[in-house]
A protein has these predicted regions:
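Long, highly hydrophobic alpha-helical transmembrane signal-anchor segments
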Residues: 1-34
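Hydrophobic alpha-helical transmembrane segments
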Residues: 12-17, 83-88, 120-124, 149-150, ...
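C-terminal ends of transmembrane helices
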Residues: 24-32, 68-78, 130-142, 186-196, ...
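Membrane-proximal soluble regions of multi-pass membrane proteins
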Residues: 26-84, 252
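Transmembrane helix-loop junctions in multipass membrane proteins, especially transporters and channels
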Residues: 32-36, 40, 98-106, 138, ...
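Functional transmembrane core segments of multi-pass inner-membrane proteins
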Residues: 107-110, 114-115, 125-232, 272-281
Length: 281
């Protein structure tokens, strides 16, 4: 069995297991951050009877299944959202790991390997933040600074360190340009049409621009465009089914995040295919 396949499999399994654990933590984040609560204290407890949740009842997905979706103490039903978020985050992390480290493309030398690990951690951070921000924006129409602003520092530090080790400064330069470009673009939209874009969207745009630009120019363009395409299609569906008023507010953050991940995962392929169509044979 090739060493590269073994390394890739270990990375994918580690990402999936880590995603399950992070998903469990994100369930705490999406509940506490909008309420202004600490994410570390007090310990997790049943929202109904307030009994502390034991460590063996906090195993991602498995504990919910073992308890049949009920609190061990008061037997109150526990929302299925908890295991869904955990499982979805685990799968999301595997997909991200497979994108950042394609099979057969895992570095074996020390410096490139550490650079690739830093890049992977940066994208897994963005994946976890994306899950939390999407849920919070849907439920509260907010994109909390407590999640968005630290992402600038995390991205610049991790991706900058990756560039320093790999020598690929072009990727970091693209990232900084993408960060500035999307931030300015969304800020202009917010100023031209107040209310159409919130400041939370503007701040998130810079974060997404950093990661998209790092990935590539095609990914940046596709990711930026996909947000408006997906959000527009969703709005049309809601209006067509009369599930939303024409003046009703629809959170745009989830579509920014979804569009960005379309850009990261398939943006390069989409951009190349489009350019090929425009290029005469």
């Amino acid at each position: 069995m090739p060493a590269s396949f073994v390394a890739w499999s270990i990375a994918a399994l580690a990402a999936g297991f880590g995603g399950l654990l992070i998903g469990s933590f994100l369930n705490v984040v999406v509940h506490r951050v909008p309420a202004g609560m600490s994410i570390s204290t007090p310990p997790s407890a049943c929202p109904s009877c307030h009994a502390p949740i034991k460590a063996y009842d906090n195993v991602p997905v498995l504990s919910w299944l073992a308890l049949r979706g009920r609190c061990r103490s008061c037997r109150t039903a526990i929302s299925a959202r908890y295991p869904i978020v955990e499982l979805a985050t685990g799968l999301f992390f595997v997909v991200v790991a497979a994108r950042i480290w394609p099979l057969g493309d895992v570095p074996t030398e020390a410096a490139p390997l550490v650079a690739a690990l830093l890049e992977l951690v940066a994208f897994l951070w963005l994946a976890g933040a994306s899950v939390a921000l999407a849920i919070i924006d849907v439920e509260h129409h907010r994109l909390p600074d407590a999640i968005v602003l630290p992402s600038y520092a995390v991205g610049l530090v991790l991706l900058g360190a990756s560039s320093a080790l790999s020598g690929d400064w072009d990727a970091l330069l693209r990232g900084v340009i993408g960060m500035a470009a999307l931030f300015v673009f969304y800020l202009a939209l917010a100023l031209v049409k107040p209310g159409a874009m919130g400041l939370g969207d503007v701040k998130l745009a810079g974060v997404l621009g950093l990661w998209l630009g790092w990935t590539g120019w095609g990914e940046l363009v596709v990711g930026a465009f996909a947000a408006f395409l997906l959000g527009g299609l969703f709005s049309v569906v809601l209006l067509a089914t009369r599930r939303a008023q024409r003046t009703g507010g629809i959170p745009f953050g989830p579509w920014m995040l979804a569009g960005a991940w379309v850009g990261v995962l398939v943006g390069g392929t989409v951009a190349a295919s489009y350019l090929q169509l425009l290029t005469p044979a």
